[in-house]
Amino acid sequence: MRAARRGVFGGIVSALVSTGVAAQQKPAPVSPGQLQVSLAEAVRRALDVQPDMVQARGDITNADWQKRVAYGAFLPSVTFSSSAFRQNVGSFVNGLPVSPGTYTYNTGLTASLDLFTGFRRLSNYRNADATEDAADAEVMNQRYQVSATTAQLFYTSLANEDLVRVAEAQLERAKQEIQISVNKFQAGAATRSDTLTATVDLGNARLALLQAEATLATAQANLARQIGVDGLVHPQPDSQLPALPDTTTLRAGALQQAPVVMQAAALERAAAAATWTSRSQYLPTLTASYTTSSQGLTEAWKGFDGGNRNVNQFRIGLSWMLFNGFQREQTTAGTAVKLDVARAQTADTRRLLSAQLTQQLAALFTSYAKIGITSANVVAAAEAGRVTQERYRLGAGTLLDLLTAQANLTQAQVNQVQARYDYLIARAQVEALVGHAL
């Protein structure tokens, strides 16, 4: 019997030693070369490198130039031309004989302006202006979407750091459990089943710690990718938990001023302007042009005087497409369909935003309430674990009671961590929906 106890005791000691070695070999929470970032720094870095944000800024550049081109349509077009030629036979230029090999110069300057285009230029400008507004709203929307995604990865990494600490505390409690069971087994107050069960619980605690560390490394790598850094990134936590925001007027303001709503409304205005552009094909186009040219033996840079022949022309033209095989009708019908779709998308965007806001606000209030509940549960579970451990040590309780109490404490701590960061993530999601800080 004593030999059996010594064998069991030796196995338990071996398990404790291997656990201690594994704990000594686990990496430190922050390595010397690991980048540490605050949430504000992480968001700033992400806004610089995320492709969606780069694309949104590029769309603004394109929209700005589209608007500039639409404005330029109201200005005259100016063209300058100049040429020089010679031939191997004699000729006459402006009635004068020209010997072979002599250069003859032609120079011209033309200015043209559309006087009336059936309001096409005005509708194009309105379309470009609405497109620019949509691009601005897209940038704002992407800024908050990227910020929310970065915040989620940031808080997920912090949560996994806390879960590693929970797993470490679980491992320490498992060590205490196995030590108590060994002491009781040596004193004859516990059975071999108790020591073996405690050994299994210790192994499970070690596995939980390894899994928590692996999950933490994955979370830190995902955060590093989000902010454009190779390797792992350590987030710096904020010690203060923000209070619940005032959401009294949040929904009404979001349905009018949220970036996604503003973008959809701007695209609707752009589609409306495009319909007027297509209708301009039914109206005539009136243009005016003025041309001055010079031809002769005098170089262009010496002026238009001398023997050159100067010609000045002024022209007004009218063009009216009366029928083009129903192409105008097809274009007009297509733009009208796009306008109907844009109006439906604007209305659906508001409905979708309202539904998402309801979901995220529910998550926000629920997670905030869970913070208080889980904190109380941790206090109660810790006290219950202490009492149960003391009862087991004195022989008034069973190992099963102790394992149950310790499992309840571990789960309560996990729930507390998840509740805190679920609240922070839900808050970031609400900010992304409404387009401003809470």
Residue ranges of model-derived segments:
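Acidic, glycine-rich loop-and-beta core segments that form the ion-binding/anion-interacting portion
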Residues: 250-295
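Bacterial N-terminal signal peptides
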Residues: 7-18
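Sec/SRP-type N-terminal targeting helices
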Residues: 54-58, 71-72, 101, 115-143, ...
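Small/polar, glycine/serine/threonine/aspartate-rich low-complexity segments that form flexible
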Residues: 25-35, 81-113, 124, 236-247, ...
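Periplasmic alpha-helical coiled-coil/stalk elements that build and connect Gram-negative outer-membrane
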Residues: 142-255, 360-363, 367, 408-409, ...
